[in-house]
């Protein structure tokens, strides 16, 4: 019989409800769970390891110790479990990730003149989403039909500005498919009202619009205004055509989500059909590795994760688009939303102002703790909802369809994954053998430097886990000490990046707050140095950068590799394999070795290393271009304290250029609206200082 050494004494575990966490040697949370009875639940993990499910066994063996928190009720445990899963993103908890990015119809409500457009990717604040749609052409046809009725803007910002400057609309404006706000044919307020009607129609509130158009058509016909009656008839047909694309499954105004699971011993597939107003508005699917859980527990975990995520996204977006007088975005809430999960779980049916929890959730198996779950969902929805298992009729038939979809999705996933896993495993195994490593490098990091003649020197750090990019862990650095006049020391730059990366690791490992040497940025986050954003949650930051790779790759040859190794020796890091890849001959260099390792050109291992190097290069160049563009846009006005963007723009618009502002007198500047003598003197002195 085999067991683990950190098993707590059974008598020390309380019998109360609570939440427990398994943590590894780096204090990283790798699993979060809840229980009605902590002692009974935790005892299941410490039986003979050979009797555990493979995934559970791997988790227990990866852990270093277990902790628990007692709460007063099962509902409180449910809330705390969800919060901690969002906070720590444990790798052994099931995360529902979609196998593709479905296109959505998006409306940029944050813009002064909102526009409708097709969109793929993670959800953004200030944008309302409809869908997902199975095909992009379905969105294009929907827009083509509905812009006849709701002629809202669909052009990009560049096209809008161009026609605004020209003073004449585009073709869509001439054929009445756009109300042409760019040339003032409609006021911003009236255009926004039109956008609201368009959004309401897409969200399923179709009857009021249809009644209004039908009444106006009849009135126009009675007034013998046959041209307008014909136009309204065409609008009515366009709306009906758009509605026909959404299959009618129920005769009543059913507002429900149907959730179907199909699982084998290792994996589970889930399909969700979103029904609004009796019509299927969207369909999504996920395939995940299965925990050693019952079907009822799987359903409960999915509902908790999916609806908790969508409710947070809706709340954050509503706060963002609440208007000029509304509150600012809750920073802690926004930071709690995982970007990857936001992409996979946040695609709601309808817009973000429609509650993400429907009146009814239909499942094929009643989830565990259904009453507590329903109470939690009711609090998210703001009104009563129920969870049911359909027994007969149309709802049962649609559940069967959803189960069929889940079965097919699981079969397709297994076929695809068999090939992918085989290739990645072969590459990692070959890399292990080529570099004489004790184990396969499941986490690999790679860094690259980017600059132009020593200016705007930046670096990137990309992360692959299990042979796949983990973009949530990407970093980018502004190099501080390695740049000179017209040149850059790449060797010193590499050394700086390695020092900052592993010094941060040591600080996290010893639970010391990150200092000035830990200045890194996540891809997609605000470009602030040193992670010093106001309100940063130390626990969240620790999760992002808290454990070392098995393999660290630098883009360069022997000088870069030796410099990186000196830094690792200086910091006492001896559990990381370090190599470099030279661009010219694709040679792999090892510290202290006179000759490189030659890996066959057709080797999966070399392909993986090249993929890492190319991704690091792409990420570094992207950041370098951003920095260079920002520098080129800067002027002396940017450095004047108390002079904001609006006033800078006003100065350049009034005087024509920064040079002419410099030539202007204090009196000329002070004469501008909003500029007093004191500010005018400050601007004049700053621009004319030697």
UniProtKB/Swiss-Prot annotation:
Its main location: cytoplasm. One of its GO terms (biological process) is SOS response. One of its GO terms (cellular component) is cytoplasm. Residues 15-94 form the GIY-YIG domain. Residues 207-242 form the UVR domain. It is found in: Cytoplasm. SMART domains: GIYc (SM00465), HhH1 (SM00278). Keywords: Cytoplasm, DNA damage, DNA excision, DNA repair, Excision nuclease, SOS response. CDD domains: GIY-YIG_UvrC_Cho. One of its GO terms (molecular function) is DNA binding. InterPro entries: GIY-YIG_endonuc, GIY-YIG_endonuc_sf, GIY-YIG_UvrC_Cho, Hlx-hairpin-Hlx_DNA-bd_motif, RuvA_2-like, UVR_dom, UVR_dom_sf, UvrABC_protein_C. Interacts with UvrB in an incision complex. PANTHER family: UVRABC SYSTEM PROTEIN C (PTHR30562:SF1), UVRC/OXIDOREDUCTASE (PTHR30562). Belongs to the UvrC family. The UvrABC repair system catalyzes the recognition and processing of DNA lesions. UvrC both incises the 5' and 3' sides of the lesion. The N-terminal half is responsible for the 3' incision and the C-terminal half is responsible for the 5' incision. This is UvrABC system protein C. It comes from Corynebacterium jeikeium (strain K411).
């Amino acid at each position: 019989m085999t067991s683990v050494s950190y098993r707590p004494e059974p008598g020390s575990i309380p019998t109360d409800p609570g939440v427990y966490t398994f943590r590894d040697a780096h204090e990283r949370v790798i699993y979060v769970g809840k229980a009605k009875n902590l002692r009974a639940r935790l005892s299941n993990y410490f039986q003979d390891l050979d009797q555990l499910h493979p995934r559970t066994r791997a988790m227990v063996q990866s852990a270093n110790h277990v902790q628990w928190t007692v709460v007063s009720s099962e509902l409180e445990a449910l809330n705390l479990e969800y919060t901690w899963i969002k906070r720590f993103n444990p790798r052994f908890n099931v995360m529902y990730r979609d196998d593709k990015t479905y296109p959505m119809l998006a409306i940029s409500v944050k813009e002064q003149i909102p526009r409708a457009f097709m969109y793929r990717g993670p959800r953004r604040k200030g944008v309302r989403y409809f869908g997902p749609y199975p095909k992009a052409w379905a969105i294009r046809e929907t827009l083509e039909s509905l812009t006849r009725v709701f002629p809202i803007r669909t052009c990009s910002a560049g096209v809008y500005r161009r026609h605004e400057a020209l003073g004449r609309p585009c073709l869509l404006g001439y054929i009445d498919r756009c109300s042409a706000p760019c040339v003032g044919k409609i006021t911003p307020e009236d255009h926004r009202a039109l956008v609201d009607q368009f959004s309401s129609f897409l969200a399923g509130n179709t009857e009021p619009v249809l009644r209004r158009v039908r009444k106006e058509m009849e009135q126009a016909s009675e007034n013998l205004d046959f041209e307008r009656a014909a136009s309204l008839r065409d609008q009515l047909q366009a709306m009906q055509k758009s509605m026909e694309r959404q299959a009618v499954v129920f005769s009543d105004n059913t507002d429900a989500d149907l959730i179907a699971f199909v699982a084998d011993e290792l994996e589970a597939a889930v399909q969700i059909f979103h029904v609004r107003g009796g019509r299927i508005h969207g369909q999504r699917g996920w395939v995940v590795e299965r925990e050693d859980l019952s079907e009822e527990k799987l359903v409960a975990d999915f509902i908790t994760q999916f609806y908790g995520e969508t409710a947070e996204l809706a709340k954050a977006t509503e706060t963002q688009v609440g208007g000029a007088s509304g509150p600012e975005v809750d920073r802690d809430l926004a930071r709690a939303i995982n970007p990857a999960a936001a992409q996979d779980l946040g695609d709601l049916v309808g817009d973000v102002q429609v509650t993400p929890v429907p009146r009814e959730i239909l499942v094929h198996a009643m989830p565990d703790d259904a009453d507590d779950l329903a109470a939690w969902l009711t609090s998210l929805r703001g009104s009563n909802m129920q969870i049911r298992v359909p027994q007969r009729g149309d709802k049962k038939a649609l559940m069967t369809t959803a189960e069929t979809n889940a079965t097919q999705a699981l079969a397709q996933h297994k076929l695809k994954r068999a090939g992918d896993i085989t290739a990645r495993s072969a590459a990692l195994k070959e890399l292990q053998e080529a570099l004489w490593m004790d184990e396969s490098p499941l986490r690999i990091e790679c860094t690259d430097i980017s600059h132009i003649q020593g200016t705007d020197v930046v670096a990137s750090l990309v992360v692959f886990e299990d042979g796949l990019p983990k973009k949530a862990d990407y970093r980018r650095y502004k190099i501080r000490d390695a740049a000179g006049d017209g040149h850059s020391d790449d060797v010193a730059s590499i050394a700086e990046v390695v020092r900052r990366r592993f010094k941060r690791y040591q600080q996290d490992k010893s639970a010391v707050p990150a200092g000035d040497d830990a200045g890194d940025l996540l891809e997609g986050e605000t470009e602030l140095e040193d992670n010093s954003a106001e309100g940063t949650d130390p626990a969240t930051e620790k999760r992002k950068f808290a454990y070392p790779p098995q393999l660290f790759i630098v883009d360069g040859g022997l000088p870069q590799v030796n410099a990186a190794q000196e830094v690792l020796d200086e910091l006492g890091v001896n559990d990381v394999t370090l190599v470099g890849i030279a661009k010219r001959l694709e040679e792999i260099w090892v510290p202290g070795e006179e000759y490189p390792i030659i890996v066959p050109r057709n080797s999966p291992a070399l392909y993986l290393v090249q993929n890492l190097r190319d991704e690091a290069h792409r990420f570094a160049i992207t950041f370098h271009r951003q920095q260079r563009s920002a520098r080129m846009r800067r002027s002396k006005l940017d450095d004047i304290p108390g002079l904001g963007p609006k006033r800078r723009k006003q100065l350049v618009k009034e005087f024509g250029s920064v040079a002419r502002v410099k030539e202007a007198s204090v009196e000329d500047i002070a004469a501008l609206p909003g500029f007093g003598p004191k500010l005018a003197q400050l601007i004049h002195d700053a621009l004319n200082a030697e």
